[in-house]
Protein backbone atom coordinates (compact mmCIF):
# COMPACT_ATOMS: atom_id res chain seq x y z
CA UNK A 1 0.00 0.00 0.00
CA UNK A 2 1.27 3.44 -0.92
CA UNK A 3 1.62 5.72 2.09
CA UNK A 4 1.99 9.48 1.67
CA UNK A 5 4.40 10.88 4.24
CA UNK A 6 3.50 14.21 5.85
CA UNK A 7 5.19 17.24 4.31
CA UNK A 8 4.15 19.76 6.98
CA UNK A 9 4.77 17.93 10.27
CA UNK A 10 7.05 20.16 12.30
CA UNK A 11 6.05 23.19 10.22
CA UNK A 12 2.31 23.87 9.99
CA UNK A 13 1.75 21.66 13.03
CA UNK A 14 3.86 19.88 15.65
CA UNK A 15 6.04 17.04 14.42
CA UNK A 16 5.67 14.33 17.07
CA UNK A 17 2.63 12.46 18.38
CA UNK A 18 2.89 13.82 21.92
CA UNK A 19 3.56 17.43 20.90
CA UNK A 20 0.84 17.37 18.23
CA UNK A 21 -1.70 15.93 20.68
CA UNK A 22 -0.89 18.73 23.12
CA UNK A 23 -1.09 21.31 20.34
CA UNK A 24 -4.54 20.13 19.26
CA UNK A 25 -5.61 20.01 22.92
CA UNK A 26 -4.67 23.67 23.19
CA UNK A 27 -6.58 24.52 19.99
CA UNK A 28 -9.80 23.11 21.45
CA UNK A 29 -9.22 24.72 24.85
CA UNK A 30 -8.18 28.11 23.42
CA UNK A 31 -10.36 31.16 24.06
CA UNK A 32 -10.99 31.39 20.30
CA UNK A 33 -11.82 27.69 20.16
CA UNK A 34 -14.75 25.79 21.70
CA UNK A 35 -13.19 25.91 25.16
CA UNK A 36 -13.36 22.16 25.77
CA UNK A 37 -12.24 18.89 24.26
CA UNK A 38 -14.42 17.00 21.75
CA UNK A 39 -16.25 13.79 22.61
CA UNK A 40 -17.73 12.04 19.56
CA UNK A 41 -21.45 11.52 19.97
CA UNK A 42 -22.00 7.81 19.27
CA UNK A 43 -25.76 8.39 19.17
CA UNK A 44 -25.58 11.49 16.98
CA UNK A 45 -28.00 11.61 14.05
CA UNK A 46 -25.43 13.31 11.76
CA UNK A 47 -27.06 16.39 10.29
CA UNK A 48 -23.93 18.34 9.31
CA UNK A 49 -23.28 18.05 5.58
CA UNK A 50 -20.05 20.03 5.27
CA UNK A 51 -17.47 22.14 7.07
CA UNK A 52 -15.35 25.06 5.94
CA UNK A 53 -12.01 24.96 7.78
CA UNK A 54 -8.89 27.12 7.54
CA UNK A 55 -5.56 25.61 6.55
CA UNK A 56 -2.96 27.95 8.01
CA UNK A 57 -0.47 26.79 10.62
CA UNK A 58 -2.13 25.62 13.83
CA UNK A 59 -0.58 28.51 15.74
CA UNK A 60 -2.59 30.88 13.55
CA UNK A 61 -5.89 29.16 12.73
CA UNK A 62 -5.94 25.97 14.80
CA UNK A 63 -8.47 27.25 17.38
CA UNK A 64 -10.80 28.40 14.59
CA UNK A 65 -10.61 24.98 12.92
CA UNK A 66 -11.22 23.34 16.29
CA UNK A 67 -14.69 24.91 16.43
CA UNK A 68 -15.66 23.03 13.27
CA UNK A 69 -14.36 19.69 14.49
CA UNK A 70 -15.98 20.15 17.89
CA UNK A 71 -19.35 20.69 16.19
CA UNK A 72 -18.76 17.66 13.98
CA UNK A 73 -17.93 15.45 16.98
CA UNK A 74 -21.10 16.57 18.73
CA UNK A 75 -23.08 15.83 15.56
CA UNK A 76 -22.04 12.18 15.40
CA UNK A 77 -19.59 9.88 13.67
CA UNK A 78 -19.26 9.98 9.86
CA UNK A 79 -18.22 6.91 7.90
CA UNK A 80 -16.12 8.73 5.36
CA UNK A 81 -14.79 12.22 4.69
CA UNK A 82 -14.19 14.07 1.42
CA UNK A 83 -11.54 16.76 1.93
CA UNK A 84 -11.22 19.42 -0.77
CA UNK A 85 -8.34 21.87 -0.76
CA UNK A 86 -6.77 24.43 -3.11
CA UNK A 87 -3.53 23.71 -4.92
CA UNK A 88 -0.81 26.08 -3.68
CA UNK A 89 2.15 24.38 -5.37
CA UNK A 90 1.08 24.42 -9.03
CA UNK A 91 2.00 20.75 -9.29
CA UNK A 92 -0.23 18.15 -10.89
CA UNK A 93 -3.55 18.23 -12.68
CA UNK A 94 -6.19 20.95 -12.51
CA UNK A 95 -8.33 18.76 -10.25
CA UNK A 96 -6.45 15.87 -8.66
CA UNK A 97 -7.74 12.94 -6.63
CA UNK A 98 -6.02 9.98 -5.00
CA UNK A 99 -8.02 6.75 -5.16
CA UNK A 100 -5.82 4.38 -3.16
CA UNK A 101 -3.23 4.26 -0.42
CA UNK A 102 -3.01 6.06 2.90
CA UNK A 103 -1.71 9.27 4.47
CA UNK A 104 0.51 9.38 7.50
CA UNK A 105 0.71 12.05 10.22
CA UNK A 106 2.38 11.96 13.64
CA UNK A 107 -0.96 10.69 15.00
CA UNK A 108 -1.04 7.63 12.75
CA UNK A 109 -2.02 6.44 9.29
CA UNK A 110 -5.45 6.98 7.71
CA UNK A 111 -6.57 5.09 4.62
CA UNK A 112 -8.13 6.58 1.52
CA UNK A 113 -11.72 5.48 0.92
CA UNK A 114 -10.95 3.79 -2.39
CA UNK A 115 -14.55 2.90 -3.17
CA UNK A 116 -15.85 6.44 -2.72
CA UNK A 117 -12.82 8.00 -4.42
CA UNK A 118 -13.27 5.84 -7.51
CA UNK A 119 -16.97 6.69 -7.66
CA UNK A 120 -16.19 10.41 -7.56
CA UNK A 121 -13.51 10.13 -10.23
CA UNK A 122 -15.77 8.10 -12.51
CA UNK A 123 -18.54 10.70 -12.21
CA UNK A 124 -16.41 13.49 -13.72
CA UNK A 125 -14.30 13.93 -16.84
CA UNK A 126 -12.31 16.74 -15.23
CA UNK A 127 -11.05 14.92 -12.12
CA UNK A 128 -7.73 13.17 -12.72
CA UNK A 129 -6.02 10.52 -10.62
CA UNK A 130 -2.80 12.37 -9.79
CA UNK A 131 -0.63 11.90 -6.71
CA UNK A 132 1.87 14.63 -7.61
CA UNK A 133 -0.57 17.44 -6.74
CA UNK A 134 -0.83 16.11 -3.19
CA UNK A 135 2.84 15.42 -2.51
CA UNK A 136 3.80 18.86 -1.15
CA UNK A 137 0.34 20.40 -0.66
CA UNK A 138 -0.64 21.43 2.88
CA UNK A 139 -4.31 22.41 2.57
CA UNK A 140 -5.66 18.87 2.89
CA UNK A 141 -2.93 17.48 5.11
CA UNK A 142 -3.55 19.95 7.95
CA UNK A 143 -7.16 18.74 8.30
CA UNK A 144 -6.18 15.13 8.88
CA UNK A 145 -4.68 15.41 12.40
CA UNK A 146 -7.91 17.04 13.64
CA UNK A 147 -9.92 14.13 12.22
CA UNK A 148 -7.52 11.56 13.67
CA UNK A 149 -7.54 13.28 17.06
CA UNK A 150 -11.34 13.34 17.10
CA UNK A 151 -12.21 9.96 15.57
CA UNK A 152 -8.99 7.94 15.46
CA UNK A 153 -7.32 6.62 12.34
CA UNK A 154 -10.13 4.28 11.20
CA UNK A 155 -12.11 7.10 9.55
CA UNK A 156 -11.37 6.89 5.83
CA UNK A 157 -11.13 9.95 3.59
CA UNK A 158 -10.91 11.13 -0.01
CA UNK A 159 -8.44 13.94 -0.92
CA UNK A 160 -9.28 16.27 -3.82
CA UNK A 161 -6.81 19.03 -4.69
CA UNK A 162 -8.14 21.84 -6.88
CA UNK A 163 -5.98 24.16 -8.95
CA UNK A 164 -8.94 24.97 -11.22
CA UNK A 165 -11.71 26.63 -9.22
CA UNK A 166 -13.86 28.32 -11.86
CA UNK A 167 -17.64 27.97 -11.66
CA UNK A 168 -17.97 25.26 -14.31
CA UNK A 169 -15.23 23.12 -12.79
CA UNK A 170 -16.49 23.59 -9.25
CA UNK A 171 -20.05 22.64 -10.20
CA UNK A 172 -18.89 19.52 -12.01
CA UNK A 173 -16.74 18.42 -9.08
CA UNK A 174 -19.55 19.18 -6.64
CA UNK A 175 -22.03 17.15 -8.67
CA UNK A 176 -19.61 14.23 -8.88
CA UNK A 177 -19.16 14.22 -5.12
CA UNK A 178 -22.90 14.54 -4.53
CA UNK A 179 -23.67 11.59 -6.79
CA UNK A 180 -20.94 9.45 -5.25
CA UNK A 181 -21.87 9.98 -1.59
CA UNK A 182 -25.65 10.21 -1.99
CA UNK A 183 -27.34 8.21 0.77
CA UNK A 184 -24.11 7.64 2.68
CA UNK A 185 -22.91 8.93 6.03
CA UNK A 186 -20.25 11.26 4.65
CA UNK A 187 -18.90 14.68 5.58
CA UNK A 188 -17.36 17.16 3.13
CA UNK A 189 -14.58 19.43 4.37
CA UNK A 190 -13.72 22.49 2.30
CA UNK A 191 -10.24 23.61 3.31
CA UNK A 192 -10.17 27.37 2.76
CA UNK A 193 -8.56 30.41 4.37
CA UNK A 194 -11.31 33.01 4.15
CA UNK A 195 -9.13 35.88 5.34
CA UNK A 196 -5.48 36.88 5.36
CA UNK A 197 -4.26 39.86 7.36
CA UNK A 198 -7.57 41.69 7.75
CA UNK A 199 -9.25 43.10 10.83
CA UNK A 200 -12.19 41.38 12.51
CA UNK A 201 -14.82 43.72 11.09
CA UNK A 202 -13.70 43.25 7.48
CA UNK A 203 -13.31 39.49 7.90
CA UNK A 204 -16.73 39.08 9.51
CA UNK A 205 -18.41 41.07 6.75
CA UNK A 206 -16.90 38.84 4.07
CA UNK A 207 -17.61 35.68 6.06
CA UNK A 208 -21.29 36.50 6.52
CA UNK A 209 -21.66 37.27 2.82
CA UNK A 210 -20.18 33.90 1.90
CA UNK A 211 -22.24 32.06 4.53
CA UNK A 212 -25.40 33.64 3.15
CA UNK A 213 -24.52 32.46 -0.36
CA UNK A 214 -23.69 28.95 0.84
CA UNK A 215 -26.95 28.61 2.77
CA UNK A 216 -28.84 29.92 -0.25
CA UNK A 217 -27.06 27.41 -2.54
CA UNK A 218 -26.10 30.37 -4.73
CA UNK A 219 -22.96 29.05 -6.39
CA UNK A 220 -22.81 31.81 -9.00
CA UNK A 221 -22.68 34.62 -6.42
CA UNK A 222 -20.25 32.60 -4.32
Regions found by a protein language model. Name each.
Residues 1-222:
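Active-site histidine-anchored catalytic micro-motif
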Amino acid sequence: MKVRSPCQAGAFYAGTKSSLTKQIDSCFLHKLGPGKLPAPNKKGKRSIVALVCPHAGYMYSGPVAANSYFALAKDGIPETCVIMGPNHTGMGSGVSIMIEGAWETPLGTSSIDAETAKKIQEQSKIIDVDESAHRLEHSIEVQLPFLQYTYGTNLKFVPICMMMQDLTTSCEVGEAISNAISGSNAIIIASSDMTHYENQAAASKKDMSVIEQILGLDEESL
